[in-house]
């Protein structure tokens, strides 16, 4: 993700979960002398990344940093293969693979060669785009953040979105006491204000018991594309916007990309650029997890690309659990955020501990565990695509 980017979540909602809650982002920033506020001060990506590494060293120093290349089913569990050639077995596996594998690029753009098209996730250093003409496609936080940062490094950037207007979060009112009526009417949560978000943030288990069609529709509609409040001033009035347009076709002509666009009124026109960045979000599709054996992928019960999960985050394959964005269809949009990790961790730990105790015949027997960082190979990409060259 781009250097200089900020998290959309507030400081109080950007903690990594641990039962004691004694090493929050606030604690980390205080130790390092980094400015912090529960709300109203954006959390920089580099600050959050440093916090994550410090959390690992302090809380789980025994975590193994290994690349998992295959996961196969066995009669009594699973076999995991590592890129080092090592392998080991486990009765239970929890997959929390994040968003890396689920980059979504619209079909009308996907035909472009990788030297002309990249996904926003692939970019960290934007300096290679200084002085170049770039088009960013999208209307959410990735698109607005990226467009603003590209403008700051000196790129000639334009933002194109099918939406007729960009949405931005409102800036939190820091230091101002909210009235009782305001707190009742629009309660604050770790993923935004309002009763719908309060339900999603505080009651993921109740969300899980909703009918499937309601859950899927809620995940699709709630928390739609919107930029962080801090990105608005970096984009509006500074980055040229082309709104209400969709890409009908994309092709390369004379070393530049030609985008064929259609407006809501049916009008058509073309835009030419050196490079296109698709800030078009992520779409869960377990078939993209190539380290999963074909047997596992074919036997998992899947709806809309995501695993169907029990109330304990267990998939239809006993012993295989999913957390993070892959659990959103089952437990709601809060699973996309660090704020939802606490619920997932507590639930999975309780279910696994109960299962182990049941098999051992004693609820008092301690649970033995091994920690392995679930690192999996990223989708292959041709050289030069990440740098935009």
Predicted features and spans:
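Flavin (FAD/FMN) cofactor-binding and adjacent substrate-gating region
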Residues: 2-34, 188-208
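Flavin (primarily FAD) cofactor-binding/catalytic cores of flavoenzymes
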Residues: 37-141, 145-389
């Amino acid at each position: 993700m781009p250097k200089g980017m900020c998290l959309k979540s507030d400081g109080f909602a950007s903690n990594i979960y641990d039962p004691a809650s004694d090493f929050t982002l606030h604690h980390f920033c205080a130790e390092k002398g980094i400015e912090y506020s529960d709300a109203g001060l954006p959390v920089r990506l580099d600050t959050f990344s440093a916090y994550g590494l410090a959390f690992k060293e302090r809380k789980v120093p025994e975590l193994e940093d290994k690349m998992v290349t295959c996961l196969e089913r066995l009669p009594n569990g699973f076999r995991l293969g590592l890129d080092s050639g090592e392998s080991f077995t486990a009765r239970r596996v929890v997959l929390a693979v994040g968003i890396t594998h689920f980059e979504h690029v619209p079909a009308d753009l996907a035909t472009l060669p990788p030297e002309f098209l990249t996904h926003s996730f692939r970019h960290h250093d934007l300096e290679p785009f200084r002085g170049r003409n770039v088009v960013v496609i999208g209307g959410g936080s990735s698109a607005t953040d990226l467009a603003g940062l590209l403008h700051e490094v000196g790129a000639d950037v334009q933002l194109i979105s099918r939406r007729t207007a960009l949405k931005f979060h409102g800036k939190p009112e820091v230091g101002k006491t909210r009235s009782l009526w305001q707190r009742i009417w629009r309660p604050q949560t770790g993923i935004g204000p309002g009763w719908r978000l309060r339900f999603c943030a505080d009651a993921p288990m109740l969300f899980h018991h909703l009918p499937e069609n309601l859950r899927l529709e809620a995940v699709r509609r709630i928390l739609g594309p919107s930029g962080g409040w801090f990105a608005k001033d970096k984009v509006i009035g500074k980055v040229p916007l082309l709104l209400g347009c969709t890409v009908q076709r994309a092709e390369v002509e004379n070393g530049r990309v030609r985008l064929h666009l259609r407006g809501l009124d049916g009008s058509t026109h073309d835009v030419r650029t050196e490079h296109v960045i698709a800030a078009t979000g992520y779409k869960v599709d377990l078939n993209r997890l190539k380290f999963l054996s074909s047997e596992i992928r074919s036997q998992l019960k899947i709806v809309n690309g995501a695993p169907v999960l029990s109330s304990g985050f267990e998939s239809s394959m006993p012993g295989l659990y999913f957390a993070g964005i892959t659990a959103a269809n089952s437990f709601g949009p809060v699973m996309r955020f660090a704020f939802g990790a606490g619920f997932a961790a507590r639930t999975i730990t309780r279910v696994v501990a109960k299962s182990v105790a049941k098999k051992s015949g004693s609820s008092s027997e301690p649970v033995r565990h091994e920690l392995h960082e679930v690192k999996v190979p990223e989708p292959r990409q041709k050289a030069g695509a990440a740098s935009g060259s």
